[in-house]
Regions:
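Nucleotide phosphate-binding/pyrophosphate-handling subdomain across enzymes
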Residues: 1-75
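A general structural signal for well-ordered alpha-helical segments in protein cores
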Residues: 4, 25, 89-92, 113, ...
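C-terminal helical cap/extension that packs against the catalytic core
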Residues: 14-15, 63-129
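Short amphipathic alpha-helical segments
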Residues: 27-29, 63-65, 89-91, 143-146
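Residue-level signal for short, function-critical loop segments
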Residues: 54-56, 80-82, 136
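Glycine/aspartate-rich loop-and-adjacent alpha/beta segment that forms the canonical ThDP
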Residues: 136-153
Length: 153
């Protein structure tokens, strides 16, 4: 059996993972760490971008702390889930700033998911990777955007 939105590669180098709680993020982090260990001779030289959003009723501080421990991540792109269920964008940014390595990691915020995705695609470089995590809503919306806007993305 295969679960949708579990490290699905939507386009070359663009992955969506439905990790939306502490256990899911922990599994996602372990998966990325294992990928890095197994492919050290084929390290990706481009940027590693994580697009993140979460619904407001989740315990998201531990999730953000775990994500910030991923040393291969160069950019965190925080965005807003539409419809009022998403966590506050400023609060999310503040937590990333608290836990990320300010020397090697950057934070970017976009209110619209489409803008976050467009920015991420523009900076990742040919050998870079983008990972979309934090919410099943986010995962589903990005999958839909990639299908609907094939020309743009």
């Amino acid at each position: 059996m295969r679960w949708a939105c579990r490290m699905d590669e939507l386009r070359p180098g663009v992955f969506v993972d439905g990790a939306h709680n502490e256990d899911g993020i922990e599994a996602f982090v372990q998966s990325l760490q294992l990928q890095q260990e197994l492919s050290e001779e084929h390290l990706h030289t481009g940027r590693c971008v994580v697009i993140f959003s979460v619904v407001s009723d989740k315990q998201y501080e531990p999730m953000i702390r775990m994500l910030c421990g991923l040393t291969m991540v160069t950019d965190f792109v925080v965005t807003q889930i539409p419809g009022g269920r998403g966590a506050n964008l400023s609060a999310l940014r503040g937590l990333f700033e608290k836990y990320m390595n300010q020397r090697t990691q950057k934070i970017h915020t976009y209110e619209k998911i489409e803008d976050a995705l467009a920015f991420s695609l523009s900076v990742r470089e040919d050998t870079g990777r983008i990972y979309i995590v934090g919410s099943l809503y986010l995962a589903g919306l990005v999958e839909s955007m990639m299908e609907d806007y094939d020309d743009r993305f």
